[in-house]
Structure formats: structure tokens, C-alpha cells
């Protein structure tokens, strides 16, 4: 029977992580459970840095960006001996189960702990929206709001100078944030990792737009696809239009979470406690068709496919 749980945030921070922690803590306390917060993700778990959390520990947290527990990259957690120390620390503290909030790397750590016999529940916390088994991740919609605001501002200056702007958006190897921002921001062109890309094809599309009378344009592109400064120089050289690159960077991860992320994080946090009390371990939580769902975390990581939002891309292209 579960009496005490641990909660940690891991990997890149995302707006809404604090709301998720709050959801876990308040739901657990309402069921008579104790909660230990673990500082700095798996690193803090390995180093046994924990704190008892009560309802006041998470007061005024639902609107705060980042994660008050902290987060850290800890690749050494791949080592089974390191994980064995982590499990020993959990058992020493009387912790019966662990809730992990983070991205795919965080899920991998939770999966490994599950394989070693320690029950974990994973909550998807990343702005990249690249987690299997869920339509949306905690932080995605806040990051989208941030990106669209930046695009709106760039459009003002691009329009004034009849300039082409290339905007690099986070997402790693997932184009969801770029696609959504392109539609919401009215971008003329979008480049995502799921679709083959060539500079020449992009330039031809831009030239076609200029021929139709476009005076300025915004190109949204997912990070890691190319050097955006070099791409901007190439576009300027081929089109004769002044072109500038903007890398939004880590500003996309910050800020107060939008209401949808607060609601999603709160629901997922409370749902994690429901699952643990129902005897589930080794699960990851998602939202599909606005319904909370859970999947076997090993199956989700190793076997599930994450569908590409091709309909979003088609929509963006129709609106160029």
C-alpha cells in the first residue's frame, strides 16, 4: 500500500511544471499520502536531496514558470549502479512510488527504474510536444503563445522594411511548435524536420510569393535543421530581399503558463495519484481527444509511434 510518494522534474524546464507538482502534492495530500520533493531531477535523487512538501509548499505556484524543485541533465543515470543508489535513497526515505515530470529522456529514466522494480508515473512536461501517447504536453501552449508574440513583433518590423525574417523555433526533431506558430502567426513559409527540405525549393517558394506581390515574408523553421544565419544570407543573395535570422532560444521555455497548460498540468498531476492508488506503476499519462489516458511506459517508449500533424502542414500551406 502506497503511503509516501516522491516527485521530481527532469530535463528541460517547461511552463506548467510547477502546476503539475502542485497537482501531485494537493491530490496526494487529499488522499492522506505524504509527498517528498526531489531537487534537480535524477541528479538530486542520486544525491539524496529531498524535502517534505505540504500544501503550503505549493501555494502561489500554479502561475509560476519554471520548476521550483529545479531540473538538471544527468546522463550518468543510464548506469544501473547509479540507478541502484537512487532506488536505495527512495527506499531509505520510505518512498513507495515516484512521479516524474519531463520529456523523453525523463521518461527513459522512469522506464529504467520501473524495470528495476520501482513504480513510476511519467507526466509529459516539455515545450517540444514530442512525447508519445499524448496529443499535447505540459508547456506546449505557453511556448506557442511566446513564439506567436515574437512573430507578431517581427512582422511589424519586417513589414516596415519589406524584409524577409527567418525565425528559428524550438522543438528538436518535432515540428509541432513550428507548425502551430506558423498557422497562428500567419507565417508565409514553414520548414519542419518531418518533411524533406532544400534551400533551393524554399527560395523558389519565396520568389513565387514575391511575384504575387508579397512585400515581406516570415519563414518559421525548427531548430537543428540548418544554420539559420547562413540560410538568411542564401535567401537574401537569391532573392535580392534583405533577410534577417532570429533565434528565439530559451525565451520560449519561460513565462507564466497559459490557462490551458495550468489546467492540463493540474489534471495530469491529480490523475497520477489516482493511478498510483489504483495500483498502477510503470505508466505514462497523456491526453487524447481531451480525455486523460495512461499507457505502459515501456511500450510507449519502445513501440508507440507519434503521428505527424500533416493536416496542420497542409493548412499552413493553403494559407501561405
Swiss-Prot record:
UniProt keyword ATP-binding, yes or no: yes
Record flagged with keyword DNA-binding: no
Notes on how activity is controlled: Allosterically activated by ADP and other diphosphonucleosides, and allosterically inhibited by phosphoenolpyruvate.
A Gene Ontology biological process term: fructose 1,6-bisphosphate metabolic process
Catalytic activity of the protein: beta-D-fructose 6-phosphate + ATP = beta-D-fructose 1,6-bisphosphate + ADP + H(+)
The protein's annotated pathway: Carbohydrate degradation; glycolysis; D-glyceraldehyde 3-phosphate and glycerone phosphate from D-glucose: step 3/4
Pfam families in the record: PFK
EC number: 2.7.1.11
Principal place of residence: cytoplasm
Binding site for substrate: 126-128, 163, 170-172, 223, 244, 250-253
Positions of Mg(2+) binding: 104
Localization terms from the record: Cytoplasm
A GO molecular-function descriptor: 6-phosphofructokinase activity
Needed co-factor(s): Mg(2+)
GO cellular component, one term: 6-phosphofructokinase complex
Subunit structure of this chain's protein: Homotetramer.
Task performed by this protein: Catalyzes the phosphorylation of D-fructose 6-phosphate to fructose 1,6-bisphosphate by ATP, the first committing step of glycolysis.
Designated name of the protein: ATP-dependent 6-phosphofructokinase
Source organism: Escherichia fergusonii (strain ATCC 35469 / DSM 13698 / CCUG 18766 / IAM 14443 / JCM 21226 / LMG 7866 / NBRC 102419 / NCTC 12128 / CDC 0568-73)
Lineage: Bacteria, Pseudomonadati, Pseudomonadota, Gammaproteobacteria, Enterobacterales
Amino acid at each position: 500500500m502506497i503511503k509516501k510518494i516522491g516527485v521530481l522534474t527532469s530535463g528541460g524546464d517547461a511552463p506548467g511544471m510547477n502546476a503539475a507538482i502542485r497537482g501531485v502534492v494537493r491530490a496526494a495530500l487529499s488522499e492522506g499520502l505524504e509527498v517528498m520533493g526531489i531537487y534537480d531531477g535524477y541528479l538530486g535523487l542520486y544525491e539524496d536531496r529531498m524535502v517534505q512538501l505540504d500544501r503550503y509548499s505549493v501555494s502561489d505556484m500554479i502561475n509560476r514558470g519554471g520548476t521550483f524543485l529545479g531540473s538538471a541533465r544527468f546522463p550518468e543515470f543510464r548506469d544501473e549502479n547509479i540507478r541502484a543508489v537512487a532506488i536505495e535513497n527512495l527506499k531509505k526515505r520510505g518512498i513507495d512510488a515516484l512521479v516524474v515530470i519531463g520529456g523523453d529522456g525523463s521518461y527513459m529514466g522512469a522506464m529504467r527504474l520501473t524495470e528495476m522494480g520501482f513504480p513510476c508515473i511519467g507526466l509529459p512536461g516539455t515545450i517540444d510536444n514530442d512525447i508519445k501517447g499524448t496529443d499535447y504536453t505540459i508547456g506546449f501552449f505557453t511556448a506557442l503563445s511566446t513564439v506567436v508574440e515574437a512573430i507578431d513583433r517581427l512582422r511589424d518590423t519586417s513589414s516596415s522594411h519589406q524584409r524577409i525574417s527567418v525565425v528559428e523555433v524550438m522543438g528538436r526533431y518535432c515540428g509541432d511548435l513550428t507548425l502551430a506558430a506558423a498557422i497562428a502567426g500567419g507565417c508565409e513559409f514553414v520548414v519542419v524536420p518531418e518533411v524533406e527540405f532544400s534551400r533551393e525549393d524554399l527560395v523558389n517558394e519565396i520568389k513565387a510569393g514575391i511575384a504575387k506581390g508579397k512585400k515581406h515574408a516570415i519563414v518559421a523553421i525548427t531548430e537543428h535543421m540548418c544554420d539559420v544565419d547562413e540560410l538568411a544570407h542564401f535567401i537574401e543573395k537569391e532573392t535580392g530581399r534583405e533577410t534577417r535570422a532570429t533565434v528565439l532560444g530559451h525565451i520560449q521555455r519561460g513565462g507564466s503558463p497559459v490557462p490551458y497548460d495550468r489546467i492540463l498540468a493540474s489534471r495530469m498531476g491529480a490523475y497520477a495519484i489516482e493511478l498510483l492508488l489504483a495500483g498502477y506503476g510503470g505508466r505514462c499519462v497523456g491526453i487524447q481527444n481531451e480525455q486523460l489516458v495512461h499507457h505502459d511506459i515501456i511500450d510507449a517508449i519502445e513501440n508507440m509511434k507519434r503521428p505527424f500533424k500533416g493536416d496542420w502542414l497542409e493548412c499552413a500551406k493553403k494559407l501561405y
